[in-house]
A protein has these predicted regions:
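Active-site-lining helix/loop region of Rossmann-like oxidoreductase modules
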Residues: 1-60
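Sparse, context-dependent recognition of short Cys/His-centered cofactor- or disulfide-binding micro-motifs
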Residues: 2, 26-28, 72-77, 89
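Generic structural "secondary-structure junction" signal
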Residues: 4, 31-36, 66-68, 91-94, ...
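Structural motif
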Residues: 21-24, 65, 102-103
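Generic, low-specificity signal for short hydrophobic/alpha-helical stretches with a mild N-terminal bias
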Residues: 23, 36, 71-74, 101
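C-terminal helical cap and adjacent loop that interface with cofactors, partners, or active-site loops
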Residues: 44-46, 59, 77-129
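Terminal hydrophobic/aromatic helix or amphipathic segment near a protein terminus
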Residues: 48-82
Length: 129
């Protein structure tokens, strides 16, 4: 069955995206790193996006940086992004099992983005509106 942490991921994602029927099948694993959460994502889209277009779209998001060099096998690792406010995405590729699916890897320092920095950024958005 699913763990409590996995169900929290399902429920919170659906709530944040206001998508109660969103299909999510997470697996969480505790690994020995001091900071940073990492997630391997497999996402099916309504229309085919393609890896290059996905990289372009990811690069437009404030607070998300693309670090993806498949030829050199360079992509975000927790030790490299620790202490940074941004989240990082890499390993962007078209999924071989579905024509409109992508797989990618995301890393972020939860002590920055998941906590203090996020609170400040939300407050700034509220003050600007």
């Amino acid at each position: 069955g699913y763990t409590g942490e996995e169900m929290k991921l399902v429920n919170e994602t659906r709530k944040i995206l206001d998508a109660p029927q969103l299909m999510i099948a997470p697996t969480t694993v505790r690994v020995p790193v001091f900071t940073c959460h990492s997630v391997a994502v497999n996402a099916e889209t309504e229309i085919k996006v393609g890896a290059e277009r996905a990289r372009e779209l990811f690069a437009r998001f404030p607070g998300l940086k693309v670090w993806d060099d498949p030829a050199e096998q360079r992509y975000p690792m927790p030790v490299a992004v620790e202490g940074q406010d941004d989240c990082w995405v890499g390993r962007v590729r078209e999924d071989l099992s579905h024509p409109s699916a992508l797989s990618f890897w995301v890393v972020g320092d939860q002590l920055r983005k998941g906590a203090a920095t996020n609170a400040v950024q939300i407050a700034e958005l509220l003050l600007d509106s």
